């Protein structure tokens, strides 16, 4: 019999090995050199300031264009209210559609870091083109002469909209990757880092709104009082700073490896399950095909536990007699792993939750369209200062800046006592609260418009279309409520689509979340078009005419409030039936 020391030695060595392992992140990430990342030297909050700085400056650049774009279209390109609003929402929709391109490239081939780097360059080129279109005399549209406003030339349109849609492409490559790349800096297998990651999403959105605050206040004033060349040039400079901030943090980052095309994997499950449509799924789920390794067959992805819904798709993981005899399991178009099948199941389960974001985004789109037009029909003077209507977006941003720390420091600890959830509310609960608050926002906007129209009628301003002498500050409540809705819904959505998505589809799922913004903007454009069509028949003014005093913008806001209410009811029904993802430990 050996000594006590000899018997204890293996246990000591095992403990040292375990301690050494915990020095490194265990979520499959690597450092810049491709080695397992040391927790002490990489990721976590050490890397986040560079990512948050990048996001803050990039959002300042984006909102520096988007926040007051409708004013440029109406005053410089001489477009009507409906045409300008449609152009804005279509462009914003495209900005949230192009993330699908960046997401597929990031998840399948380049990884999030290099995708951000590449599309940042495209973004900067677009910003530069837009600045030139507002600065170079030959590229600027002619000014109005009295009531006559000459149309912009085809070359001027091409330069302006070319730059605008290069920005849409550039931001599309960045959007689905930055929040996920930031969350990648926290090890999912470490309980402490998981809590920090939940906090990261709050401060990520906080950074977005710091950039938006500068844009919606200072930049809007510069654009309308010091010229659009300077007003577009400053955001271009900040886009350059965003790129610099991102690259400075490179040595500190943790990187997740691309896992191959998610679209191919989804297609393989569909094809394999169809090919085995006559095969019976065994009652014992352990008989379904899965690799024996700790990690899944998908690069950079943990295994996902089997679930009993969508059982038809399980046929793709049934090992046929032919495959069992040959021992050849390599053809993924005939046989898929349980993890691969579960990836598709997760996307299917997410769909009803995902769809709720479309109506919410249609409501959010009003901040840069109809809220601005409503403000232009009000008294924008504060003392001797002329306040640009788009600058009211500052109150939405201020609301977010107030609500984020309030939520993170006070609401979460309080909610934790009642819900038992470490982060206060689950992502689904948080999003549901945001949907309810969005209904209140549209109701507030409608009430302000009712008051404005009554005053216009009492003062005889209906025919002239002159701004009504009611302070634009009456709009503050609707902006402030919208900011609160954002903190609950958009941040909850960010976290939901990161946590619930398969490991190798996180950029794609972030892009799908952003796609709701695109569809929401397109839906807003569609609703505007339909409302205009149906309310202007028989020679009527319509709800949204160029003279808002003779229209009924309040009806439009009530319509959106009603749609939001229905959307909320459908969401709660779907959320009650949602099954959470379970990754194998």
Curated annotation (Swiss-Prot):
Example GO BP: peptide transport
Residues bearing PTM N-acetylglycine: 2
InterPro entries: MFS_trans_sf, POT_fam, PTR2_symporter_CS
Designated gene of the protein: NPF8.3
Keyword terms of this UniProt record: Acetylation, Membrane, Peptide transport, Phosphoprotein, Protein transport, Transmembrane, Transmembrane helix, Transport, Vacuole
Biological role: Peptide transporter. Mediates the transport of di- and tripeptides. High affinity, low capacity transporter. Can also transport histidine.
Protein family per UniProt: Belongs to the major facilitator superfamily. Proton-dependent oligopeptide transporter (POT/PTR) (TC 2.A.17) family.
Cellular component GO terms, alphabetical: Golgi apparatus; plant-type vacuole; plant-type vacuole membrane; vacuolar membrane; vacuole
Tissues expressed in: Highly expressed in young leaves, roots and germinating seeds, intermediately in stems, flowers and mature leaves and at low level in siliques.
Major localisation: membrane
Protein name listed in UniProt: Protein NRT1/ PTR FAMILY 8.3
Mechanisms controlling activity: Inhibited by leucyl-ethionine.
Transmembrane portions of the chain: 91-111, 116-136, 154-174, 200-220, 228-248, 351-371, 387-407, 431-451, 472-492, 511-531, 556-576
Topology in the lipid bilayer: Multi-pass membrane protein
Cell compartment(s), UniProt: Vacuole membrane
GO molecular function, one term: dipeptide transmembrane transporter activity
Chain positions with Phosphothreonine modification: 115
Species of the source: Arabidopsis thaliana
């Amino acid at each position: 019999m050996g000594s006590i020391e000899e018997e204890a030695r293996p246990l000591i060595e095992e403990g040292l090995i375990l301690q050494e392992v915990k020095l490194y992140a265990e979520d499959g990430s690597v450092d810049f050199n491709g080695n397992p990342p040391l927790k002490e030297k990489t990721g976590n909050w050490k890397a986040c300031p560079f990512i948050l700085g990048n996001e803050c400056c990039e959002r300042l650049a984006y909102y520096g264009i988007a926040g007051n774009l409708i004013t440029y279209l109406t005053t410089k390109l001489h477009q009507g209210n409906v045409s300008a609003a449609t152009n804005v929402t279509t462009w914003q929709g495209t900005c949230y559609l192009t993330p699908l391109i960046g997401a597929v490239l990031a998840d399948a081939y380049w990884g999030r870091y290099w995708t951000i780097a590449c599309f940042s360059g495209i973004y900067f080129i677009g910003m530069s083109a837009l600045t030139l279109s507002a600065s170079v005399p030959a590229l600027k549209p002619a000014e109005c002469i009295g009531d006559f406003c000459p149309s912009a030339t085809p070359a001027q349109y091409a330069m302006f909209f070319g730059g605008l849609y290069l920005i849409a492409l550039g931001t599309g490559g960045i959007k689905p990757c930055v929040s996920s790349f930031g969350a990648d800096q926290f090890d999912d297998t470490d309980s402490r880092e998981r809590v920090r990651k939940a906090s990261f999403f709050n401060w990520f959105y906080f950074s977005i709104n710091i950039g938006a605050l500068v844009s919606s206040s200072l930049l809007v004033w510069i654009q309308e009082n010091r010229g659009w060349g300077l007003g577009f040039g400053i955001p271009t400079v900040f886009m350059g700073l965003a790129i610099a901030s991102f690259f400075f943090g490179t040595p500190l980052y943790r990187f997740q490896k691309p896992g191959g095309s998610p679209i191919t994997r989804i297609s393989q499950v569909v094809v394999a399950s169809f090919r085995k449509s006559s095969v019976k799924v065994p009652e014992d789920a352990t008989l379904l095909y899965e690799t024996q390794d700790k990690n899944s067959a998908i690069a950079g992805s943990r295994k996902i536990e089997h679930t009993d819904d969508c059982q038809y798709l399980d046929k793709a993981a049934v090992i046929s007699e032919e495959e069992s005899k040959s021992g050849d399991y390599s053809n993924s178009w005939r046989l898929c792993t349980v993890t691969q099948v579960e990836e598709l199941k997760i996307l299917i389960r997410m769909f009803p939750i995902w769809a709720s974001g479309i109506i919410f985004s249609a409501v959010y789109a009003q901040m840069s369209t109809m809220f601005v037009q409503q403000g232009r029909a009000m008294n924008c003077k504060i003392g001797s200062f002329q306040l640009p209507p788009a600058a009211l977006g500052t109150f939405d941003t201020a609301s977010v800046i107030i609500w984020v720390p309030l939520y993170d420091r006070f609401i979460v600890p309080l909610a934790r006592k009642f819900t038992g959830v470490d982060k206060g509310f689950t992502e689904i609960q948080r999003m549901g609260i945001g949907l309810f608050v969005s209904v209140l926002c549209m109701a507030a906007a409608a009430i302000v418009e009712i008051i404005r129209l009554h005053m216009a009628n009492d003062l005889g301003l209906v025919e002239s279309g002159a701004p009504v002498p009611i302070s634009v500050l009456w709009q503050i409540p609707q902006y402030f409520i919208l900011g609160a809705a954002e903190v609950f819904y958009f941040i909850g959505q960010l976290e939901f689509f990161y946590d619930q998505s398969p490991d190798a589809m996180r950029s794609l799922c972030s892009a799908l979340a952003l796609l709701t913004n695109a569809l929401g903007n397109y839906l807003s454009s569609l609703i505007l078009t339909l409302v205009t069509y149906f309310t202007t028949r028989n020679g009527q003014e319509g709800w949204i005419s160029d003279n808002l005093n003779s229209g009924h913008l309040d009806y439009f806001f009530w319509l959106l409030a009603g749609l939001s209410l229905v959307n909320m009811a459908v969401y709660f029904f779907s959320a009650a039936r949602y099954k959470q993802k379970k990754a194998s430990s």
